[in-house]
UniProtKB/Swiss-Prot annotation:
Cofactor(s) required for function per UniProt: Zn(2+)
Signal sequence range: 1-21
Chief localisation class: secreted
UniProt name for this protein: Leucine aminopeptidase 2
Keywords: Aminopeptidase, Glycoprotein, Hydrolase, Metal-binding, Metalloprotease, Protease, Secreted, Signal, Virulence, Zinc
Domain PA: 124-218
Temperature behavior of the protein's activity: Optimum temperatures are ranging from 40 to 50 degrees Celsius.
Subunit and interaction comment: Monomer.
Amino acid sequence: MKSQLLSLAVAVTTISQGVVGQEPFGWPFKPMVTQDDLQNKIKLKDIMAGVEKLQSFSDAHPEKNRVFGGNGHKDTVEWIYNEIKATGYYDVKKQEQVHLWSHAEAALNANGKDLKASAMSYSPPASKIMAELVVAKNNGCNATDYPANTQGKIVLVERGVCSFGEKSAQAGDAKAAGAIVYNNVPGSLAGTLGGLDKRHVPTAGLSQEDGKNLATLVASGKIDVTMNVISLFENRTTWNVIAETKGGDHNNVIMLGAHSDSVDAGPGINDNGSGSIGIMTVAKALTNFKLNNAVRFAWWTAEEFGLLGSTFYVNSLDDRELHKVKLYLNFDMIGSPNFANQIYDGDGSAYNMTGPAGSAEIEYLFEKFFDDQGIPHQPTAFTGRSDYSAFIKRNVPAGGLFTGAEVVKTPEQVKLFGGEAGVAYDKNYHRKGDTVANINKGAIFLNTRAIAYAIAEYARSLKGFPTRPKTGKRDVNPQYSKMPGGGCGHHTVFM
């Protein structure tokens, strides 16, 4: 009798002390998660219902978008929080923060001809600057790239190598009156300077075609440019949603995330409703199983304005807490209409940008997912242009998937993935046409299954995965860009 009472006391103590991270009801009777079982729980109808819900949040408000701090994004955050909380399987929180929102518009005229330009967010305003145009060398990332006579002139800079913010700052140091950054790939260019900086000058983006034409004209003679930039600024309260499984080892956390906000131009259903709903679908499917390692899901805010939400989160963790995160997986645009199956190049073999130790193994795992089904895939540059940036800067292994943004699909890629050559992976990238109709159902379904495949693997075991690198600082030069001018893997057009 005494031993029975002791057992009861232990059980009661365990229950009463298990509030934080307490295993959900029925946990012992759930089957252990496997890759096949978790993938089989992924249903296209659930994914499409999710993206349609996000579309409804955009449609319900005059802005017709889901920009952080706006009504469409507030609805998105509340819905994600409530949906995940209702499962009872996760400890869920909203992480409040305040960030500076910016909206900018530009008008550009060269020698009497109007050009289609996009102001960089966080650009200083400009009221009818009229000045001669000069051209910077070598992407304008160093002081020596700017002509000696730059002072008081508007400088034309090609995109690439460094961030838009750095280009604007260098132009400011050279005492330019303004800067125009033109694309280094076909198509228009919009982006962000990443925040306010006293060194910045009024800055606008221009298409590759128009930029090259201007450079040619400057080489032939004097070009006069008129530039107007209207910029609005506002501090906005917003939230990340963080959900961690109640069960599993909380010292061995598998983390994944997707940003939940859109740009001003439209509802952002591929960018990045696709990633948000992809990980939500996996989160709900995971509730049918038990696991060995805890899994932490994150829906980031304000990615489109400089990876603000994910950076805020990572900076909120000390080295000890962040060391519990054994790897981070990022999913930003996984339903592109003219898609290509792309995996972050964690081993650096394709783009010579290597992630922290373990990033290569993440890449190989996703390669195996596609290879086992005979599905083509290719690497995409590990540039730091999406929400994994803050993690790799602190030496957390990372990886993920991306189906393409504004870059044009090649004939060689059509042979691999189908689709249309000479057309962007997502022709509605950062535009009002990024609606539910913009989603490639096959791509989003396949990539959501790939997420499930990876989560099942790592939630079950980290056997064979490299020992987590010591948490610390790592030099990363994000090639930010995801606005027309980057790519969401690639996201936030910073560069």
